[in-house]
Swiss-Prot record:
Protein family according to the UniProt entry: Belongs to the peptidase S24 family.
Pfam families attached to this UniProt entry: LexA_DNA_bind, Peptidase_S24
GO annotation, cellular component aspect: protein-DNA complex
The name this protein goes by in its record: LexA repressor 2
Residue range(s) of DNA binding per entry: 27-47
Functional description taken from the UniProt entry: Represses a number of genes involved in the response to DNA damage (SOS response), including recA and lexA. In the presence of single-stranded DNA, RecA interacts with LexA causing an autocatalytic cleavage which disrupts the DNA-binding part of LexA, leading to derepression of the SOS regulon and eventually DNA repair.
Organism: Xanthomonas axonopodis pv. citri (strain 306)
Amino acid sequence: MDLTDTQQAILALIAERIDADGVPPSQTEIARAFGFKGIRAAQYHLEALEHAGAIRRVPGQARGIRLAGQGAQTRTAPVSEVARDDVLRLPVLGRVAAGLPIGADIGSDDFVVLDRVFFSPSPDYLLKVQGDSMRDEGIFNGDLIGVHRTRDARSGQIVVARIDEEITVKLLKIGKDRIRLLPRNPDYAPIEVLPDQDFAIEGLYCGLLRPNR
């Protein structure tokens, strides 16, 4: 199926955002970028892209768009049983709060083997989510999120951040004279980082796995 110029441009935008931010654009952002009056037009073009095999969509996720060839695979088998060039063996390093910050619980409890192309950018480890403050981004309690280890992040990216000795996952907003960590659930209040707090970016959110439960 041939793609229209608009659909090719939307596909390019999706790839660009995944490469730059680690997450695809939302339907609202696609509609805004192309001047659509509502998200229905964005949905129409995404349906066409999916039908053409250019993307696949994950039901129930606000940004559940994956480029063709991306897919989740959890394995309990040893790494030697799958092609080493195509997979990552990632440690599950405890918990991260999607709610109020919780005390860090970082330790290698388990490993997950998954397709190398599942996340972007490539993750260094996984954290288990506790809480539902990021539910509108499709991140739910019990999910395993991929984290790309870095100290650098831009405003608008979803980050794993440390405040004193506590770890949380939130949307980073950097203002002229303040830093805030925003939930994606109206039941939670933003967290403002105070000047006397020890604050650091631990990594970028780059996708998730949803264990069977």
